[in-house]
Amino acid sequence: FAGIIWGNSSYALVSSSWYDTRNTKTFVLNPSSGVARLIVDRNSQDIYSNPGSVFRDKNEFGMFTMYINKDKSYWVGPGFTKDGEFPFIEELDLKTLKKKRLYTAKESELQERIVQIVDINKGDILISLQSATQFPNYYAKNIKSGKQQEITSIVNPFQSLAAVQKEVLNYKRNDGVDLSGTL
């Protein structure tokens, strides 16, 4: 047993993991009937098969539970591929267990991270964009239209370190042993 994410009287997610085999399983459980159906069965160390995390929202009691809209849940994943990391949002029909990819980040010189689903019905999400030289900034993005609007404009506070480069130092110790180090 690894945890339960409650949804409503018809749906909850139950996870189990086994350390020795690195196997993790997730089931859609009907709490009312006790019927469970397997939706994820994978090696926890296989980043390419990572389905992501289910989107949670506050319920009427102020508790975060699985967001369910017309028997559908939404998953945000890191999207590792052989070509790079392309975060995604996927819709899972909890009745049929069919998946539908709603959004996948495009290849860019900036790394995109999905921070939050704001309104899945409208397609509004919050993302973060950054690079090796550009500090992370937040954007409101609509996955239906593709439009995005900058929310923050934080300048890299470490700009003075941008010109710093690695250097390998080679030297000889007093006893004659050659040593090297990266500075």
PLM-predicted stretches and their roles:
Residues N43-S49, F55:
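Blade-loop segments of beta-propeller domains
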Residues S73-Y74, I125:
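Entry beta-strands of beta-propeller and related beta-repeat scaffolds
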Residues P78-G79, I89:
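A cross-family structural signal marking well-folded subdomains
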Residues T81-D83:
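Long, low-complexity regulatory segments enriched in Ser/Thr/Pro/Gly and acidic residues
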